[in-house]
């Protein structure tokens, strides 16, 4: 069976690996991954990689399940020999608010969730309420490299080319297309509900920062208040969230806003050396689009599995979505009478 995966961010690569691991042993798959951007030039490479969903309940309850499945999968990998190459580690830190808020739906997923004590809040004089918990860090650049290695070992081919239309892929004789094009999905099929959520980050050298610090201001919206997330080599400072802004240029205004607010939150950052600055686009949509569609162009047709629209939480939800996409792929095989599938061990 010929499979074309379009998109090489965390969603595309993880979905490709999940499908190939589950079905290739019983039904040989000739899989190619098409993209005009590979690591380190994808949106996933810009992500700091903290596992944390949005604070509000998802409009699609299934997304909460996909978040949980991703956490469980990553936690099972935490002590494996692959963890370091994956960019996977435990990380603890703070969520800060100016007013009391309800506990998040994911509080029982993360480890050691609790409310901050008065003495802890004294460290953050601009905030009066907060949580502390331990979560997972999955650094995008390391993880994409690891996924690429796993897929290459399995014989999956990578094609550095922009796909202009579904029609060109279908007419090329592909049986199944996996559409993981993220914020650019609208170029292949119109989707009025998909928008870019532009983000900009500063990476600094600050090895003394050990905990993440996320602040929340409902009046500014998600990702528009300062956050600090330490990684294995650098610390990520953010953030901005600009809906509908397609500018890939780093903004001096946004840089100054991020730097000033993060240094106010953690004054020791004033001594940190700036290592880099990146801009990326979150694929914002009211809900993740994860569904099947059959496309026909003349006498040629193919099944398409859409998997995009993960907003700013692609790394948080990716493996649950990959497993669901693999389930849809299995149904396609069943309908084609090709399913001699072994039980999943994922």
Curated annotation (Swiss-Prot):
Renumbered ranges of motif Microbody targeting signal: 344-346
Q: Which positions bind D-dopa?
A: 52, 282, 312
Biotechnology: applications noted = In comparison to human DAO, has relatively poor activity on D-serine and other substrates, raising doubts regarding the use of rat as a model system for testing drugs against schizophrenia or amyotrophic lateral sclerosis.
Q: Could you tell me what reaction this enzyme catalyses? A: a D-alpha-amino acid + O2 + H2O = a 2-oxocarboxylate + H2O2 + NH4(+); D-alanine + O2 + H2O = pyruvate + H2O2 + NH4(+); D-cysteine + O2 + H2O = 2-oxo-3-sulfanylpropanoate + H2O2 + NH4(+); D-dopa + O2 + H2O = 3-(3,4-dihydroxyphenyl)pyruvate + H2O2 + NH4(+)
Query: Keyword Secreted: yes or no?
Result: yes
This enzyme's EC code(s)? 1.4.3.3
Q: Which residues form a coiled coil?
A: none
Q: Where in the cell is it found?
A: Peroxisome matrix; Cytoplasm, Cytosol; Presynaptic active zone; Secreted
Q: Name one GO biological process term.
A: killing by host of symbiont cells
Keywords in alphabetical order: Cell projection, Cytoplasm, FAD, Flavoprotein, Oxidoreductase, Peroxisome, Phosphoprotein, S-nitrosylation, Secreted, Synapse
SS bond partners? none
> Where is the region Required for protein stability?
1-16
SUPFAM superfamilies this protein is in? FAD-linked reductases, C-terminal domain (SSF54373), Nucleotide-binding domain (SSF51971)
Tissue expression, as annotated, is: Expressed in the cerebellum, liver and proximal tubules of the renal cortex (at protein level). Absent from spleen (at protein level).
Recount the UniProt induction comment for this entry: Increased in pups born to mothers fed D-alanine during pregnancy and suckling; not induced when mothers fed D-aspartate. Not induced further in the cerebellum following two weeks of intraperitoneal injections of the antipsychotic haloperidol.
**Recorded GO CC terms:** cell projection; cytoplasm; cytosol; extracellular space; mitochondrial outer membrane; peroxisomal matrix; peroxisome; presynaptic active zone
Can you tell me which residues bind D-proline? Answer: 227, 282, 312
Tell me which cofactor or cofactors this protein depends on. Answer: FAD
Which EC class is the enzyme in? oxidoreductase
- Which protein family is it in? Belongs to the DAMOX/DASOX family.
Subunit structure as annotated in this protein's UniProt entry: Monomer. Interacts with BSN (via coiled region); the interaction is direct and inhibits DAO enzyme activity.
UniProt function note: Catalyzes the oxidative deamination of D-amino acids with broad substrate specificity. Required to catabolize D-amino acids synthesized endogenously, of gastrointestinal bacterial origin or obtained from the diet, and to use these as nutrients. Regulates the level of D-amino acid neurotransmitters in the brain, such as D-serine, a co-agonist of N-methyl D-aspartate (NMDA) receptors, and may modulate synaptic transmission. Catalyzes the first step of the racemization of D-DOPA to L-DOPA, for possible use in an alternative dopamine biosynthesis pathway.
Protein name, please?
D-amino-acid oxidase
Which classification does the entry list for the species? Eukaryota, Metazoa, Chordata, Craniata, Vertebrata
Q: What gene makes this protein?
A: Dao
């Amino acid at each position: 069976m010929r499979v074309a995966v379009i998109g090489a961010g965390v969603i595309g690569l993880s979905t490709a690996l999940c499908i190939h691991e589950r079905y290739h042993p019983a039904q040989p798959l000739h899989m190619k991954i098409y993209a005009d951007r590979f690591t380190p030039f994808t949106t996933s490479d810009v992500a700091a990689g903290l596992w944390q969903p949005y604070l509000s309940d998802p409009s699609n309850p299934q997304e909460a399940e996909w978040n949980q499945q991703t956490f469980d999968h990553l936690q099972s990998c935490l002590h494996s020999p692959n963890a370091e190459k994956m960019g996977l580690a435990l990380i603890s830190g703070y969520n800060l608010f100016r007013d009391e808020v309800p506990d998040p739906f994911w509080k029982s997923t993360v480890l050691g969730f609790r409310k901050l004590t008065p003495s802890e809040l004294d460290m953050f004089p601009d905030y009066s309420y907060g949580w502390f918990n331990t979560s997972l860090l999955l650094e995008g650049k390391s993880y994409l490299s690891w996924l690429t290695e796993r897929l290459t070992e399995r014989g999956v081919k990578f094609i550095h080319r922009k796909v202009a239309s579904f029609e060109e892929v279908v007419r090329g004789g592909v049986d199944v297309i996996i559409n993981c094009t993220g914020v650019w999905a609208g170029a292949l099929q119109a989707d009025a509900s998909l928008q870019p959520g532009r983000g900009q980050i500063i990476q600094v050298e600050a090895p003394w920062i050990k905990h993440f610090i996320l602040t929340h201001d409902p009046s500014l919206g998600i990702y528009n208040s300062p956050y600090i997330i330490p990684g294995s080599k650098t610390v990520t400072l953010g953030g901005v969230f600009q809906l509908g802004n397609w500018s890939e240029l780093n903004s001096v205004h946004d840089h100054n806003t991020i730097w000033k607010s993060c240094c106010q939150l953690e004054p020791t950052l004033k001594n940190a050396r700036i290592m880099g600055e990146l801009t990326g686009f979150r694929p914002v949509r009211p809900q993740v689009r994860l569904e099947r569609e059959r496309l026909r162009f003349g006498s040629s047709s193919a099944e398409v599995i859409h998997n995009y629209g993960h907003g700013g939480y692609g790394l948080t939800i990716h493996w649950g979505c990959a497993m669901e996409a693999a389930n849809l792929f299995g149904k396609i095989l069943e309908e084609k009478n090709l399913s001699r599938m072994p039980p999943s061990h994922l």
